[in-house]
Structures are given as C-alpha cells and as structure tokens.
Regions:
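Nucleotidyltransferase catalytic core that binds NTPs
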Residues: 1-129
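Hydrophobic residues in well-ordered beta-strands that form the structural core
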Residues: 33, 181, 218-219, 243-245, ...
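N-terminal Rossmann-like dinucleotide-binding module
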Residues: 129-174, 444, 448-450
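Beta-loop-alpha module in the N-terminal Rossmann-like domain of NAD(P)-dependent dehydrogenases
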Residues: 145, 175-233
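C-terminal helix-rich "cap/oligomerization" subdomain common to oxidoreductases
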Residues: 172, 185, 192-195, 408-450
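Rossmann-fold dehydrogenase core element
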Residues: 231-248, 269-273
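Predominantly a Rossmann-like dinucleotide-binding segment in NAD(P)-dependent oxidoreductases
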Residues: 249-319
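Contiguous beta-strand/loop segments that form the cofactor/metal-binding neighborhood of enzyme cores
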Residues: 305-379, 406-416, 449
Length: 450
C-alpha cells in the first residue's frame, strides 16, 4: 500500500483545496492530510485564518479524499510524521517548489500543479469569501507581493496585467498565474486590484479600477499630486470601495507599536523626527535611469514621511530640499527639512549615497531610536536623560511585510475598520502633495544644488 501525506491550513475551503487533495489521493492508496493549527500558522507568518480548526478539519473530511486526518501543531513536525506513519510520498503544491526538497531524505516528494483560477464563490455556510487579486505591473515589488499574498488566508492572486505582453507572460510563467490581456479581463476575475506599475501611471490605473468597483492597494508613492489623491479617495467613498496606499511599514506590528509608544507621552511632547533611508541601487535600475520620475526622494521619501506625518501631523509648513544629483538631474541623495507648528523634521534618502539609516523621535522627556532597517520595524529603544534607563521593544516582522497590508485590506473588506488609523486618507493626501511639490521644485531647478 502506497501512503501519501499532504498538509495545509484549508481555510475558507475552495476548489483549489479540493483539487490538491484529489491529486494527492491519486498518487497512492491511502491519503493522510495534516491540518495546521492557527498557532502553527502564526509561528510561520501566515495571517488572517478565518475558520476554526474543527471547521477546517470537517471540510477536509467532507471532500472524501482523506483516509486519515492529523493535526500539524509545530514547525518541523512533517519529517517526524512521515516516519511515524511510514509515508511513501510527500505531496505539496507547485507554488512551493524547492521548499521541501529536504524531505527527500525521508520519502519521495511530489510537487502538485496548483489551481490558478480560484473561484470567489463559497459554500453557503461560510460568511467570508475568497478575495481574488489582480496585479497591474510586473516589477520586483509585484513578485514580492505575490509571494506574500500566499501567506494571507482568504486571498488568491489570479493573474497579472502589463501593457507589455512579453513582460506579463514571463512574470506569469515564473509565478504560475494567468496573464490578462486587457484590464477588462482582470476586472472580471478580481475583487482587489494591486497597482505596482511605474509611479506616473498610478492615478489612471487606480481611477479605472475604482470605477469598475474594485478595492485597490496602490504602491507608494500613491500618486504625484494632492488633487489626484483627493479625487481617488472621493471615488472610493462614492463607490463604497476600500483604497489605501501600500507603504508596508505602516501596517507592520513593530511600527504600529513604535507610534503607540511615541504618542503615549512616555517621551513627552514630540518636537523632532529624523528619518533616514538609504540603499545603493544599481545604476541601470529604473530608479536611477528614469529622468522624470526616478531618484531617491520619489522612491524612498514615502517611508521617511510616514513617521513624520503620523507624529507631527498633516499641517506642515515650508519644506526645503537639498540634493546631490547626477548629470541627468536625477537625485542620488536628498535631504529635506520640514517645519510644523510644534516641531521640526528631517528626511534623508539616498540611492547613490550610503548613510547610517535610522529613525529618531525626540521628545521633551526622552527619545526613541530604531536602527536600520527601521522601515521593517522589529526593534526599538526608548532612552531618557538618565543613560542607564533604557526600555526595549521588539516585534516579529514576517517576510517582506506586504502580507500585513494585504491582511488589513481583507479585514476592512470584511467590515473590520479598526486598522484604518495605520495610514489614513488625510496622511496619503498630504504625502502626495509633498511629492508634487518636490517634482515642481526639481522641474524649476530649485533642488539639485550640488
């Protein structure tokens, strides 16, 4: 008798789960299915599990393919299960190719073809449905988003659109998803649109998606003018759609905790915020070759503006910019100084100059410091006048962090609006206005001073 084992969360049981179990069963005579506990999922960074364990087990049983159901409670359990149950074949979806090659030491490993087109319709007894996602854009961030979406229960990436069809086909082949030849095709297969196209195209793509009654996550920078941002949020409200800017930092637990501590009064009144984010980018990258919309500030400025706006407010005054530019006037390094009614702030961004990146929040009783990469906040400290008094905070940060914004989008779609404070409409509008101001000053030659 050939024994096969496979594992999964099997949350919001859908056709993709059914087909996986069907294919696994066909590999042998006896199928063991491991259903993962919510605690185990959390430990490996999977978010948003909706159904309780017993419901998920019952759905697997009802499929009719499982001869035996076990519970996966700990990371690392798979190898011991294979030995315990004398398993011959370990089966897993093809989206995990390479991840379980180590299991070849214990049994044969088979990667099963995944179901690309997961339907959004659900059994009648389920309250929430699978939210299908369509991606616009095929750059690096789109690939990271797709991988992160797999770690959020209740979502399924259906396919990708790029007006350059060859790029879309290469991307779709790499990630085993469909290609949408038109936006209309995408809209028919998705409830959520993720816009990861070049900066200057965001407005038209977001507007079109909203007008087709889609929820939208748009990569930073959201749009490049204050007016455009207002128009898009107005459309979202009129259509009763969820719209937010995808600055991953805003949604991660560590950054949320940092903002809470800063606002709590622990360091007194906040008077100064200094945010620095630099990285050395490839000289041939889009960021350093796009004369109109490339450069450090447009690429990294949103990250630095985020803590400043959240802690000092939306009512900034004059902003001064100083940049080091190349011969094409693309800023390799930009330093911006902002004035607020009750505080000051500085931003430092660089793609061609490396500096010590950190976030500093200074108050009348103490200060908070988070070292690089603070935009993936896992650790920060609170310091006081008494140097011996240091308070330390830490949080997990999973993967690339995009799973947190996907999770928040699903929560809001399902009626839980408690996370709206993480990045508000007003904050995104203000940041869009600052991007607009920067572009205007750069166009007039008032920025590239060095």
């Amino acid at each position: 008798m050939t024994k096969v084992i496979t594992y999964g969360t099997f949350d919001l049981f859908h056709e993709g789960h059914y087909r996986l179990l069907q294919r696994a069963k066909a590999l042998g005579d006896y199928l063991i299915v491991g259903v993962t506990t919510e605690n185990c999922d959390r430990a490996r960074g999977k978010l948003n599990v909706v159904d309780d364990l017993m419901t998920r087990i019952e759905n697997v049983r009802k499929s009719g393919f499982a001869d035996e159901i076990i519970i996966e409670e700990t990371i690392g359990q798979k190898a011991s299960d294979v030995q315990k149950y004398k398993v011959d074949i370990f089966a897993v979806g093809s989206d995990r190719i390479g991840n379980f090659d180590y299991m070849e030491d214990y049994c044969k490993v088979v990667y099963l073809e995944r179901t690309k087109d997961v339907p959004s319709t659900m059994p009648q007894n389920q309250v929430f449905k699978i939210q299908r996602i369509g991606i616009i854009g095929t750059g690096r961030i789109a690939g990271r988003f797709l991988k992160e979406a797999k770690c959020v229960s209740g979502s399924s990436v259906q396919g990708v659109y790029n007006p350059h069809k060859e790029s879309a086909e290469l991307f779709a082949t790499k990630y085993e998803i469909d290609v949408f030849n038109t936006l209309e095709e995408l809209y028919k297969k998705a409830e959520i649109v993720y816009v990861a196209s070049p900066h200057e195209t965001h407005y038209e793509y977001v507007k079109d998606a909203l007008e087709h009654d889609k929820h939208v996550i748009c990569e930073k920078p959201f749009v490049l003018s204050k007016t455009q941002a207002k128009v898009l949020f107005d459309i979202a409200k009129q259509r009763n759609r969820i719209l937010f800017e995808g600055i991953k930092t805003a949604y991660c637990p560590g950054f949320t905790k940092l903002i809470e501590v800063a606002r709590s009064g622990l360091i007194g009144n906040i008077r100064y915020v200094d945010a620095c984010f630099t990285k050395l980018e490839n000289k041939e990258s889009r960021e350093l070759t796009d004369i109109q919309y490339g450069g450090s500030f447009l690429e990294l400025g949103s990250y630095c503006l985020l803590p400043i706006i959240k802690l000092l407010g939306c009512g900034h005054g004059e902003i001064s910019y100083d940049s080091i530019c190349d011969e094409r006037h693309i800023d390799l390094f930009t330093k911006a100084s902002l004035r607020f009614p009750k505080g000051l702030a500085t931003i430092t961004c660089g793609l061609g100059v490396k500096s010590e990146g950190r976030l500093l929040v200074a108050g009348t009783k103490g200060y908070i410091v988070a070292e690089a990469p603070w935009w993936k906040t896992t650790y920060f400290e609170v310091h006081y006048e008494d140097a011996s008094k240091v308070e330390k905070y830490s949080e997990r940060f999973w993967g690339d962090g995009l799973r947190y914004e996907i999770s928040d989008m699903l929560n809001q779609i399902n009626g839980n609006h408690k996370s709206e404070f993480k990045l508000t409409e007003a904050e995104s509008i203000i940041m869009a206005g600052i991007m607009e101001e920067f572009l205007e000053k750069r166009k007039r030659g008032n920025i590239c001073n060095i």
